[in-house]
Amino acid sequence: MRFGIADAVMRPLPSPPSMPTRFFNTYSRQLEEFRPLDPAGKCVKLYTCGPTVYNFAHIGNFRAYVFEDLLQRHLEARGFEVERVMNLTDVDDKTIRGCRQLGVRLADFTQKFKDAFFDDLGTLRVKRATHFPAATEPRFIARMIEMIAVLLEKEIAYQAEDQSLYFRLSKFPEYGKLAHLNLDELRPSGRVQSDEYEKENIGDFALWKAWDEADGDVKWDSPWGPGRPGWHIECSAMATALLGPEIDIHCGGVDNIFPHHEAEIAQSESVTGKKFVRYWMHCAHLMVEGQKMAKSAGNFYTLRDLIEKGWTGREIRYALITVNYRLPLNFTFDGLRAAQSALGS
């Protein structure tokens, strides 16, 4: 008996119990069978790193968000109930610089880009997360201060002469395991360098940044004086406040692995004493026409730029999922045209 493609499509798939869900875990660099923390094996706690709302999100960002959307849909199709958190970073150097340049309040500056982000998610048909916490919400600022206080009490954190607080990497020997780096070989670069005030060791990262004039009116009171949270503690606080000390899956782009996700592990596990995340999943970089996306190269696109050029959300979404999430994606206009043809639009 011969079978055609239509017959193969119509044949029932094996029942879920015979097909265990497996994910590639960045931490172990291996495919692992997925077993949720929930004793009933039903509920999944998923944390995904969201945007820094200082500008419109670009297509590189949305590659990760569409991947995370597919992950959630896959889990739900497998019968899991997903509680997903996607954070909004609404206070950092970029957001402060942006609001000060325009002479507006930080909250007013970031709200424009929060609203735009939610509109863009709708354009790409990305499911809404269960929670979209913003770093500046009072309950999360309180959680950050609480966590830092615990780290100070354990002497894992310290206050420098400039009144900023730092995490002592020497107190967390597991640091670097996610990125598979040797702690002794780490050298500061990029966002790590921006955390340098007056530290005991060059690798120590900021937990709380003491206020200075460049921050304008962006500051919160704390037991250590006015200031603002470091980037890393924001996610640790929001994740543990909403999902508890242990999370099933944590996602993000590969650029988040170091130092951000390494720092999250160090902070969270030092406070709670529990394994922070069981499965780490990271989306690879997106290039445009074979080159790194950059405004200086003229190949930097927000989702809105592409919509203005006449492409639809469906076509862009299709183009973003044509390559395995762990492989770099070369985003091209030929690829968009292929997506358009495949969708019959």
Task: Please provide the spans of the model-predicted regions.
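Alpha-helical recognition segments enriched in aromatics with Gly/Pro capping
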Residues: G4, M10-Y54, D69, A142-G344
